[in-house]
Amino acid sequence: MKNLNIYIFSMIAVGMLAFSCENAIQADEDGGNQTDTTSFENDHDSEKSEALKIADPENIKTKMIRTTLNAKSESKATGDITFEERTGQVVMEAKFKGLNKGTHAIHLHEIANCSSSDGKSAGGHWNPTGERHGKWGDAEGYHKGDIGNFEVGDDGIATVRFETAEWCIGCDDENKNIVGRSVIIHQGGDDFISQPSGDAGKRVGCAEISEYQEK
C-alpha cells in the first residue's frame, strides 16, 4: 500500500512538472513572437514615417518670386508672374491682360531694370552661355531666356506656363540663376530665326525678377 501511494504521488508530481514546463515553453514562444513582431512593426513604422517625412511637400524647400508686369511703349499690358523652384525645377506661371490679339513673344532679358518707357533698360536677351538665338531646345542653340510665343484672344487675356530645370532661383550658377533678370513681352511673335532676338517688335511689358522668398 505504501509503495502504491509513493507511485501515485510520483506520477502526480511528474504530471504537474510536465504541465508547468509546457506552459513555460508556450509562454516563452508567445512572448518571443510578440516581441519580434512588435519590434519589427516599430522599425517598419519608423522607416515608413521617415520616408513620408522626406516625401512630404512641407519638408521640401521652395523658392518663390512674385512680380508684376508694367506696360511699356504706350501699351495697356498688365499682369502677374510667379516663379517657383521646387525639387530642381523652376515653374513660371503668368496671367496677362490688356494685350492686343495675336501672337506675342516672351523672353527673359539680362537686367532687372524696367525703368525706361520702352523697356530697353532691361538690356538684351539673357544669354549667359553665348548661344545663337533660337527656339527653346533647338540643337543649333538657344538663349536661356528664349521662352517662346503665346497667343492672346479677343479679350486681351493670356496665361503662360513654362517649366524647366535649366533655371534656378538664387543659386550660385550664373548660367541658371534668373534673379536679376527681367521678363519682357513683345508686340509681336518671335520668328526664332532673326538674330539676335527673333524680330518680335516693341517691348510692350516688363517685369523685374528680383527678390525671392524661401519657405
Give the residues covered by each predicted segment:
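Hydrophobic helical h-region of N-terminal Sec-dependent signal peptides
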Residues: S10-A13
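Bacterial N-terminal signal peptides that target proteins for export
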Residues: M1-I8
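N-terminal leader/targeting pre-sequences
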Residues: E22-T103, E110-K215
